[in-house]
């Protein structure tokens, strides 16, 4: 399973963006919300995004609700549209404070990484007060490479991988 581990980590690390699924307050209840954002990924498989509070999803992120992320192969790169490689992660959410100090995550270091990946637009975005940064820490996930090639991922280091299988005729 080391090969699968290496593949899914590489798949995350090369992604420029991620789909984000949140749950938001809506008419006294909740409603699902899906969006995307450019992202960076660190060596611990945490995903970071920089988004405006003007976006609907941001209120759910500020509330630090659990979130689902999906990294997915582009339609142009896939051989078969029904078999796009994808990585789905279930994550905790944390807003990154702009303050500095030992108890804070390194805002400046993350901004430097965003700038290296996406260019000067990041300097403009972080200068705007409505832009917030969030970290998604994976709890568990599923890596899907094709038919019969799905793998559950779990563990503190997200390194425990098992092939998903079921018997023919078995209901999922």
Protein language model regions, located:
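Short, well-ordered loop/turn elements at secondary-structure boundaries
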Residues: 14, 43-44, 64, 127-130, ...
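Catalytic micro-motifs at enzyme active sites that drive phosphoryl/nucleotidyl and oxygen chemistry
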Residues: 25, 34-37, 58, 76-80, ...
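C-terminal edge-of-domain segments
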Residues: 3, 105, 109-113, 119-172
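Short, structured beta-strand-loop surface elements
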Residues: 56-116
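An N-terminal domain-cap segment
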Residues: 1-62
């Amino acid at each position: 399973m080391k090969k699968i581990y290496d593949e899914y980590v590489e798949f995350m690390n090369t992604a420029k963006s991620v789909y984000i699924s949140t749950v938001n307050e809506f008419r006294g209840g909740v409603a699902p919300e899906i969006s995307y954002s450019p992202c960076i990924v660190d060596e611990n498989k945490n995903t970071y995004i920089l988004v405006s509070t003007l976006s609907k999803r941001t209120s759910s992120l500020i509330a630090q609700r659990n979130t689902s992320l999906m990294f997915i192969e582009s339609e142009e790169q896939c051989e078969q549209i029904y078999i796009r490689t994808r990585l789905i992660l279930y994550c905790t959410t944390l807003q990154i404070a702009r303050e500095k100090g030992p108890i804070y995550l390194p805002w400046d270091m993350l901004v430097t990484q965003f700038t290296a990946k996406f260019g000067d637009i990041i300097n403009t975005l972080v200068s705007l007060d409505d832009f917030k940064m969030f970290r998604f820490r994976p709890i568990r996930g599923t890596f899907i490479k094709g038919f019969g090639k799905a793998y559950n991922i779990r563990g503190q280091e997200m390194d425990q991988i098992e092939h998903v299988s079921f018997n023919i005729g078995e209901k999922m």
